[in-house]
Each structure stands twice: as structure tokens, then as C-alpha cells.
From Swiss-Prot:
GO terms for molecular function: arogenate dehydratase activity; prephenate dehydratase activity. Converts the prephenate produced from the shikimate-chorismate pathway into phenylalanine. Dehydratase that uses arogenate and prephenate as substrates. Utilzes more efficiently arogenate than prephenate. Required for chloroplast division prior to ARC5, but in an ARC3- and ARC6-dependent manner, especially involved in the Z-ring formation. Residues 1-32 are annotated as: Disordered. It comes from Arabidopsis thaliana (Mouse-ear cress). This is Arogenate dehydratase/prephenate dehydratase 2, chloroplastic. Residues 1-66 form a transit peptide. Residues 100-275 form the Prephenate dehydratase domain. Pathway: Amino-acid biosynthesis; L-phenylalanine biosynthesis; L-phenylalanine from L-arogenate: step 1/1; Amino-acid biosynthesis; L-phenylalanine biosynthesis; phenylpyruvate from prephenate: step 1/1. Its EC number is 4.2.1.51, 4.2.1.91. Expressed in roots, leaves, stems, flowers and siliques. Most abundant in leaves and seeds. Keywords: Amino-acid biosynthesis, Aromatic amino acid biosynthesis, Chloroplast, Lyase, Phenylalanine biosynthesis, Plastid, Transit peptide.
Length: 381
């Protein structure tokens, strides 16, 4: 099989994962050519045009003609992904052999397992940061991203809520993963030898009772599998990692204890992200995610939620985040935060009742965006 590499910046590595040092999307990188060994000339032309295309060229001229050329190439080529229907989404889940999926972390991360559940047989591509995974999809380095959004014990992943708004990706599905934490150490290290434990802050919090009983000093790192990798590579004999059983196998560590999480029903929900939305259907249970903002005033949030209650639409989640551009608003002698509201509700955008609810919400929302309408994951792994 021909090897392929992506040359966008010196720090960008395709097969070894994707670093956070990607060129900014609003700046044209030098020599931005994507080469696929032994690929067709049409495919080479496609990715060359993609790498060079920006909203405006260096002299400020409109690139609309160039954009039309790219659009035509997309339509003519069978090599590039097209907008997905819900049926195609199901097919891609059952046969994801050519799908490249970005996740945050290193090999053995729970996010890698979620990516493999969402797209079996996919090529899972590790990224250093959540931001990098979003940008990798936008810049065609990968086809999809699978990123955590909430945990049943630790709550919401606020960083990814902010990134959903900042980037122009669409939620095309969700996947729920049962998280089973293990305590990992090097072979020959007994539990009595341990003095400290390394892991992601949420993983440490989810194992609070066990770690307190063991009297271990907590040390936070970027991700669970990264902690396991550090224990193995640095040959630490006084430290353990909270990570997955899969991470133990990858890094050759001993499982000192299994299922150390405080709650056996420890579940993380991940979002499947793509460049194009799927076409919502009505043949199965769908969920829709939106974000909106409101003018301040008595009962305004009540009115916003009432548009769903009046139509018997069930809300499954509501999350508020301060509005970054206008964080504080003065009223009299007081200052208030302005908020964005992220809401998930059980309905497909193909349903007229959901469409009517959003039309109603638009009447008094100052901002409204549909993040995605996608099938609900009813399985657990």
C-alpha cells in the first residue's frame, strides 16, 4: 500500500497523530500541498486546490471562482465524502474501513475506544488537543472526529461546547461508552509501593473514594492513556495511572486493581463530528442539538423553554456558557453575564413539530444555530 503524508507545517504528522501546531485557518501556509502516493491525477488536483483555497487571496481578491472550481471537483469525484444521509451514516458505522477519525489523546485513550465503536475498522488518528481534532476535520486531514461532551459523574466537557460554536462542524451522531477505570503500574510494583497516581483530572475525580483509601497523591495530566504511557516510558516504581484495560495492554503495564470508579454506572457521551450535516430522518429516534442566546428580561428563559413544552418535546440537556464577546452587561449599578444556552431535545429536524418550535424560538432569540440533528445511541459498551 502506498504511503501518504500531509505537509502543512513541520509539526503536523499524519500517521503519528496530529499535533496542535497546525497553521491557522486564516493564513495560507507555505508549500501547502497534500500528496497521496500513487493517487490519481484528479485526486492530486483536488487536494492541491483544497490546500491553497482561502476565503480571500493575499491581495484581498475574492476567491469565489476558485471556490466554484472546488465545488465542481467535489461533485465530480467519487474520492471525496458527500453530504451524508442517515442511511449512509448507518452504512459508514458498519463499514468504516476507509474512514479516518480524529480523537483527543494517545493510543489507549477512552476516546479511541469511542471512535472505534462509532466507526468500526476506522483509522483512529490521535490529536494532542480538542482544538486540533476540530481543525483536522475542517482541513480534510481526517474524515470525522469523535470527542467527549459529557460524563455521568464529572458533568460537561465545557471546552468542547465552546469549540462547537467556534468551528463550523456538524454533529452527525453520538456514542455512549461505559468507562471502567483500572489502576495500572509497572510489573513488580505492588499496591503498597505506590505513593502517587497520574491521570486526567476527571478520571481522578471519578475514582475519589478508592484513591483516598489508598492515600495516593493525585497528579493531573492531559489524558488517561498519556498517564499510562508516562508510567511505562519513565519506568516509575512509586506511581500508578488511572486508565483503561486497553492502555495496560498497549504499554505493557500490570493491572493492580479493576473497576476503581466510585460509581459503576460511569458513562461518557461522545459526539461524532463531520464537515457536512446528515439528512435527518423519522425512521428512528433522533436528537437535535442547538445553541441560542436571549435578551435579558423577566421570564425570557421560561419563554424559550416553553416553545418545547407546548409541543410535548422532551429536553434531554440544557447547558449555559458565558458569552465571550460580551461577558458583562451593566444594568443600574449591577453587572450581569450574558449567556449562550446549549439545548438537546428529542426530535428530528425532519419533524414539523421541531421546525415549528425553532421558528417560535427565533421570534425572541438574539442568536440561534442548529448544531446537528442525529440518531440517538441506545447501546452501551
Amino acid at each position: 500500500m502506498a504511503m501518504h503524508t500531509v505537509r502543512l507545517s513541520p509539526a503536523t504528522q499524519l500517521h503519528g497523530g496530529i499535533s496542535s501546531n497546525l497553521s491557522p485557518p486564516n493564513r495560507k501556509p507555505n508549500n501547502s500541498i497534500v500528496r497521496y502516493g500513487c493517487g490519481s491525477s484528479k485526486r492530486f488536483r483536488i487536494v492541491t486546490v483544497l490546500a491553497s483555497l482561502r476565503e480571500n487571496d493575499a491581495n484581498g481578491r475574492d476567491n469565489s471562482v476558485r471556490a466554484m472550481e472546488v465545488k465542481k471537483i467535489f461533485e465530480d469525484s467519487p474520492l471525496l465524502p458527500k453530504p451524508l444521509s442517515s442511511n449512509q451514516l448507518t452504512e459508514s458505522v458498519s463499514n468504516g474501513s476507509r474512514v479516518r477519525v480524529a480523537y483527543q489523546g494517545v493510543r489507549g485513550a477512552y476516546s479511541e475506544s469511542a471512535a472505534e465503536k462509532a466507526y468500526p475498522n476506522c483509522e483512529a488518528v490521535p490529536c494532542e488537543e480538542f482544538d486540533t481534532a476540530f481543525e483536522a476535520v475542517e482541513r480534510w486531514l481526517v474524515d470525522r472526529a469523535v470527542l467527549p461532551i459529557e460524563n455521568s459523574l464529572g458533568g460537561s466537557i465545557h471546552r468542547n461546547y465552546d469549540l462547537l460554536l467556534r468551528h463550523n462542524l456538524h454533529i452527525v451522531g453520538e456514542v455512549k461508552l461505559a468507562v471502567r477505570h483500572c489502576l495500572l503500574a509497572n510489573h513488580g510494583v505492588n499496591i503498597e509501593d505506590l505513593r502517587r497516581v497520574l491521570s486526567h483530572p476527571q478520571a481522578l475525580a471519578q475514582c475519589e473514594n478508592t484513591l483516598t483509601k489508598l492515600g495516593l497523591v493525585r497528579e493531573a495530566v492531559d489524558d488517561t492513556a498519556g498517564a499510562a504511557k508516562q508510567i511505562a516510558f519513565e519506568n516509575l516504581n512509586d506511581a500508578a495511572a488511572v486508565a483503561s484495560e486497553k492502555a495496560a495492554k498497549i504499554y505493557g503495564l500490570n493491572i493492580v486493581a479493576k473497576d476503581i470508579q466510585d460509581d459503576c454506572d460511569n458513562v461518557t457521551r461522545f459526539l461524532m463530528l463531520a464537515r457536512e450535516p446528515i439528512i435527518p430522518g423519522t425512521n428512528r429516534l433522533f436528537k437535535t442539538s442547538i445553541v441560542f442566546s436571549l435578551e435579558e428580561g423577566p421570564g425570557v428563559l421560561f419563554k424559550a423553554l416553553a416553545v418545547f413544552a407546548l409541543r410535548q418535546i422532551n429536553l434531554t440537556k440544557i447547558e449555559s456558557r458565558p458569552l465571550r464577546k460580551h461577558p458583562l452587561r451593566a444594568s443600574g449599578g449591577l453587572k450581569y453575564f450574558d449567556y449562550l444556552f446549549y439545548v438537546d431535545f428529542e426530535a428530528s429536524m425532519a419533524d414539523e413539530v421541531a421546525q415549528n418550535a425553532l421558528r417560535h424560538l427565533e421570534e425572541f432569540a438574539t442568536f440561534l444555530r442548529v448544531l446537528g440533528s442525529y440518531p440517538v445511541d441506545t447501546t452501551m459498551l
